[in-house]
């Protein structure tokens, strides 16, 4: 059964608002283009009404911070299962988009804009052509689903096909209309599927059991703190923190600062927790991280926001180096996902090379 949601007017006698309908799918699309946060604050729209070459048009195309693409199909009424087949067909087109083709799509959408400049401005990082469109996800935006469609989507997502549904409902409030929306599946889980299936175009191989971790340093995050106190962390939104849930005690992680290079290898000790729950082992005993870390003042600013707060995974370091001695060579794997399970041959080469540089990796 599709997710149902209602808005109530608060008062001595609460009153539920009556439902309404949008005039057209075009109206919904126009709203999303004007305010992409209706879908996600962590994506950037790059295309609209693009011809697939398969006799159809995709409604919207977005890009995530790791360079993966998001195919978005809009349906204002009940969505039959045939729409899933259509979306999968469109996804086959998205999968084969080249860097040049994606840049052209964005140029049309932005009236001549530069994709790499827009990406840098939006996400604060350089767009890596090697990781652009390594993976993608499908999002259906619909008022409701029939039961068959819902079963199909759950089946696909459970098997690591990154597909989700954003249910929306329109309510009438006097002369105004209000839009409510809710995800069928936690979007972080879908992103975790994207990270799990990330692969280089073309050749791939079974995952080797070694985890890649992106640890971006800055005003809210210090490698020297992480190295000294034994942790990795991420924050700023569910897109960045959700993949930390892929890690379990005993997993081995190879940690890279994308702007610097590889900094260390360690084993996971505890599952992910928020900054308010994470403690630091000091000479004076166990203390809250917010009382110890050098970046604590910045971390406190978002500590009570469950979406934006920093999240931590405790790690036992096996071997580390300072930032000025980071391992950064041509041909080593890199990715913007906080955690992923790469299946590219480059990852096998990277781990083999790193084992030569971080010699205590097996301790």
Which residues fall in each region the model found?
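Residues at beta-strand starts and edge strands
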Residues: 56, 68, 262, 309-311
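A short beta-strand micro-motif
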Residues: 213-216, 254, 315
């Amino acid at each position: 059964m599709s997710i149902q949601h209602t808005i109530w007017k608060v008062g001595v006698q609460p009153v539920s608002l009556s439902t309404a309908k949008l005039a057209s799918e075009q109206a919904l699309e126009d709203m999303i283009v004007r305010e992409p946060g209706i879908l996600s604050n962590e994506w950037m729209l790059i295309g609209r009404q693009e011809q697939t070459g398969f006799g159809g048009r995709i409604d919207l195309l977005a890009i995530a911070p790791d360079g993966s693409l998001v195919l978005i199909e809009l349906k204002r009424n009940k969505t039959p299962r045939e729409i899933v087949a259509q979306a999968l067909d469109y996804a086959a087109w998205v999968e084969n988009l080249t860097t040049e083709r994606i840049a052209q799509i964005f140029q049309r959408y932005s009236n001549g804009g530069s994709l790499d400049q827009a990406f840098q401005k939006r996400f604060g990082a350089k767009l890596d052509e090697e990781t652009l469109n390594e993976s993608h996800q499908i999002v259906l935006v619909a008022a409701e689903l029939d039961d068959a469609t819902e079963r199909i989507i759950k089946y696909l997502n459970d098997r690591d096909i990154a597909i989700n549904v954003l249910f929306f409902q329109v309510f009438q409030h006097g002369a105004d209309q209000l839009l409510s929306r809710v995800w069928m599946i936690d979007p972080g889980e879908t992103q975790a599927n994207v990270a799990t299936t990330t692969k280089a175009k073309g050749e791939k191989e079974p995952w080797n059991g070694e985890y890649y971790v992106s640890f971006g340093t800055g005003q809210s995050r210090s490698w020297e703190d992480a190295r000294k106190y034994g942790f990795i962390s991420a924050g700023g939104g569910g897109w960045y923190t959700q993949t930390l849930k892929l890690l379990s005690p005993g997993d081995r992680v190879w940690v890279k600062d994308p702007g610097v290079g590889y900094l260390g290898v360690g084993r996971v000790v505890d599952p992910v927790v928020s900054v308010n729950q994470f403690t630091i082992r000091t000479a004076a005993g166990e203390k809250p991280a917010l009382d110890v870390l050098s970046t604590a003042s910045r971390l406190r600013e978002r500590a009570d926001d469950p979406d934006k707060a920093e999240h931590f995974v405790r790690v036992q370091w096996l071997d580390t180096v300072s930032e000025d001695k980071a391992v950064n060579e041509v041909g080593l794997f890199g990715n913007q996902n906080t955690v992923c399970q790469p299946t590219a041959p480059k990852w096998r080469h990277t781990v083999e090379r790193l084992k030569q540089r971080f010699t205590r990796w097996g301790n």
